[in-house]
Amino acid sequence: MNAVFIAALLILGTSTFDAMRLWNYCTHILCTNDSDCGQSDSCRCRPPRGDDYRYHCSRY
């Protein structure tokens, strides 16, 4: 039973770490088109908002 519990924690930790890596990669990147934001479909190049004149990658 301990081995199953440890395996479950490792799987959960790995999936959480992977999601965090994708989130950090997608934010705060300047871009000109969607291909600059990487291969993820959820990470897109967004137009500027407010006082910022630059395009940036974000997940929405």
UniProtKB/Swiss-Prot annotation:
CC terms in the record's Gene Ontology section: extracellular region
Record organism: Ixodes scapularis (Black-legged tick)
What's an example of a GO molecular-function annotation for this chain? Answer: toxin activity
Family per similarity comment: Belongs to the ixodegrin family.
Q: In which tissues is it expressed?
A: Expressed in salivary glands.
Question: Where would one find the signal peptide in this protein?
Answer: 1-19
Highest taxon, organism lineage: Eukaryota
Put simply, this protein is called Ixodegrin-like peptide
